C-alpha cells in the first residue's frame, strides 16, 4: 500500500491548480502543442502521478531530463510521448527504442555513435535536434552543423527526425538576448523544419509568441510559479500555486532563559519559552539556512530556532500550543509570507531549487476537488 504514512509531514499537491495552469497556457498558445515538463520527479511533486493526472485531461506529450526518468514513467503505465531533454549515452539507444522514447540529438557525432548500437529489428527512435542559441550547454551552433545532424539522422532507418529545439538563457529578464537567440535559432533551422519546433520554456511561453514554433515546454509554471518577478509583472496569465509543505508538532517542551537549542547551540533563549519540534529536516528538502525563518503555526507566525537538523526542526511557539499543531512551511497562497517565492528569496536562491529539493520520502497528498489521494513512495 502506498497510501499509508506514519510521519505527520507531507506535501499537499493541488492537481486542479496544475490542470488550470496547463489550460491557461493552452489558451495563450491555442495552435501549439504544450509539452509538460515533469523532470526532477515532477519538480519534486511526483512525476508519475502528475503525468497520470494530466493525461486524464488530454495531455499527450511529456519531457524529462534523463533516460531513467523516462523509463520510470513507462514502467508506471505512462503511454504518452516522452522526450528526454538531456544527452543519453549512445550505447543506451536500444533502451530508448524498446520504450518508444524521443531523444535529444546534440550533434552529428552523437548520431553516428548511436547508429552503431541500433539493430535492424529495433523499433524507431524519435530524435529532436538541439540547437545552442546561447545557453552554452549542448547542441549545434551553426547551420552547417545542424544540416549535418539532419543528414546523419536521415541515413539511419530507425531514426526519425521529429523535432528541433533550443533553450533560451535569459527569457526571464528584460533584455535583447532572447530576441537574438530566437533569430539565431530560426536562421539555423531555416531549410530543415521537422514536425515539432520548440524554443519556449516557461518564461518565454508567458512572454513571447514565437510564431515560427509550434510547441512550448511548460516547466515551473505548470506548478503555478513564475520564472521571475519580471515575468510575473509582464504576464497576463494568472497562475495558481499548487504546492503546500506541512508538518505537525510531535513534541512540546518548556525551556528556561539561557537554554540553547540544536547543534552548535546557535540559539539561546532570552526568556522562558515554549519550543515545538517538527518531524522535518534538511533530508526532506528543508534547508539548514532556514534557521530564523517564520513558519505559519495555525495562523500565527513563529520562528524556526536553532539549526535545522537532518530529520527535525524546532520553533518557538505560543504558550498554549498543543501536540498536533500544524504548521505551513511553504504555502500555496502567493500572497503569504510562506509562499514559495518568498522562501526562495529568503534563502537567496530560486523557486526551482527549493521545489526540486523536496525529498521522495515526503508523502504527497493529491487534491482534486474535495477528493484526496495519498501517495507515499516509501510504501509503494
UniProtKB/Swiss-Prot annotation:
HAMAP family: Ala_racemase. Pathway: Amino-acid biosynthesis; D-alanine biosynthesis; D-alanine from L-alanine: step 1/1. Catalyzes the interconversion of L-alanine and D-alanine. May also act on other amino acids. GO terms for biological process: D-alanine biosynthetic process; peptidoglycan biosynthetic process. PROSITE patterns: ALANINE_RACEMASE. It comes from Macrococcus caseolyticus (strain JCSC5402). It is an enzyme of class 5 (isomerase). The active site is at residues 39, 263. It catalyses: L-alanine = D-alanine. Gene3D superfamilies: Alanine racemase, Lyase, Ornithine Decarboxylase, Chain A, domain 1. Its cofactor is pyridoxal 5'-phosphate. The modification N6-(pyridoxal phosphate)lysine is found at residue 39. Its EC number is 5.1.1.1. It comes from the Bacteria. Belongs to the alanine racemase family. GO terms for molecular function: alanine racemase activity; pyridoxal phosphate binding. Substrate binds at residues 137, 310. GO terms for cellular component: cytosol. This is Alanine racemase. Keywords: Isomerase, Pyridoxal phosphate.
Amino acid at each position: 500500500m502506498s497510501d499509508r504514512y506514519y510521519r505527520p509531514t507531507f506535501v499537499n499537491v493541488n492537481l486542479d491548480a496544475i490542470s488550470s495552469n496547463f489550460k491557461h497556457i493552452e489558451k495563450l498558445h491555442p495552435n501549439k502543442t504544450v509539452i509538460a515538463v515533469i523532470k526532477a520527479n515532477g519538480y519534486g511533486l511526483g512525476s508519475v502521478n502528475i503525468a497520470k493526472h494530466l493525461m486524464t485531461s488530454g495531455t499527450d506529450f511529456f519531457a524529462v531530463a534523463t533516460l531513467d526518468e523516462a523509463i520510470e514513467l513507462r514502467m508506471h503505465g505512462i503511454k504518452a510521448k516522452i522526450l528526454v531533454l538531456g544527452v543519453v549515452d549512445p550505447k543506451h539507444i536500444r533502451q530508448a527504442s524498446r520504450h518508444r522514447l524521443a531523444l535529444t540529438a546534440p550533434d552529428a557525432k552523437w548520431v553516428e555513435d548511436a547508429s552503431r548500437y541500433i539493430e535492424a529489428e529495433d523499433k524507431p527512435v524519435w530524435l529532436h535536434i538541439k540547437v545552442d542559441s546561447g545557453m552554452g550547454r549542448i547542441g549545434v551552433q551553426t547551420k552547417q552543423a545542424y544540416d549535418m545532424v539532419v543528414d546523419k539522422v536521415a541515413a539511419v532507418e530507425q531514426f526519425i527526425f521529429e523535432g528541433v529545439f533550443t533553450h533560451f538563457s535569459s527569457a526571464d529578464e528584460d533584455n535583447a538576448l532572447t530576441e537574438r537567440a530566437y533569430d539565431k535559432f530560426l536562421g539555423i533551422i531555416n531549410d530543415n523544419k521537422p514536425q515539432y519546433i520548440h524554443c519556449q520554456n516557461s518564461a518565454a511561453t508567458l512572454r513571447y509568441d514565437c510564431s515560427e514554433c509550434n510547441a512550448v515546454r511548460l516547466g515551473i509554471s505548470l506548478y503555478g510559479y513564475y520564472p521571475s518577478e519580471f515575468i510575473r509583472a509582464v504576464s497576463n496569465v494568472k497562475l495558481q500555486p499548487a504546492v503546500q509543505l506541512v508538518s505537525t508538532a510531535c513534541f512540546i517542551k518548556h525551556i528556561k532563559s539561557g537554554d540553547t537549542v540544536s547543534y552548535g547551540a546557535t540559539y539561546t533563549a532570552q526568556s522562558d519559552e515554549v519550543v515545538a519540534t517538527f518531524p522535518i529536516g534538511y533530508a526532506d528538502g528543508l534547508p539548514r539556512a532556514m534557521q530564523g525563518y517564520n513558519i505559519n503555526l495555525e495562523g500565527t507566525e513563529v520562528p524556526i530556532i536553532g539549526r535545522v537538523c537532518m530529520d527535525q526542526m524546532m520553533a518557538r511557539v505560543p504558550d498554549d500550543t498543543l501536540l498536533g499543531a500544524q504548521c505551513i512551511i511553504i504555502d500555496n497562497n502567493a500572497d503569504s509570507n510562506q509562499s514559495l517565492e518568498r522562501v526562495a528569496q529568503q534563502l537567496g536562491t530560486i523557486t526551482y531549487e527549493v521545489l526540486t529539493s523536496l525529498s521522495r520520502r515526503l508523502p504527497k497528498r493529491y487534491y482534486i476537488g474535495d477528493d484526496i489521494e495519498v501517495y507515499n513512495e516509501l510504501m509503494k
